[in-house]
Amino acid sequence: MLVIGNGLSRSKIDLNKIYQEKIGCNAVFRDCYIDHLVCCDKRMVKQAMGHGHPSIYTRPRWADDFNHEPVQHLPNLVEEGSDRKDDPFHWGSGPYAILLGAFMDANIQMVGFDLYGVDKKINNVYSDTEGYKSSDNSATDHSYWVYQIAKVFTWFPQTTFRIYNTPEWDMPKEWKLANVSLDTLDKL
């Protein structure tokens, strides 16, 4: 299972040439076919529905608002803690996409989960497009993503997570677990 984030590192990869089941985040449907699309933002759900995407996952509290067959509930978190970053409402599409993948498959490949800004600016292939911030905006604080994705890795110790990124990308120390590995994009 390939789980696709929207970091700039994946911008030169032709996702249509990767032939395996895919979970993607938000606007990735604009560029390639995704089997399962995760949208935690209502505007993105509406865009995906307008595009006719057949399988959209969103927050349970919003899925029923759409009353539309392809819109499904995201899975519940395995555990909920007491911190703000443990609250399901504060989980974004990226961490939820990895969680969904872990429920579906025991071998997860991840691409486009760059986390960090570039020159302190937004790091997203869809910057400057509908529903996204300007590429001139400051980088998003990545601490919630690091924490939440680390939770998924620990909740699924029998699942293998292989992250593909550039050679200079630093994997967060919280992700350095026995079931998580890092490889370069050319190995994808």
Regions found by a protein language model. Give the residues of each.
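Metal-ion/cofactor- or nucleotide/acyl-coenzyme-handling active-site neighborhoods
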Residues: 1-188
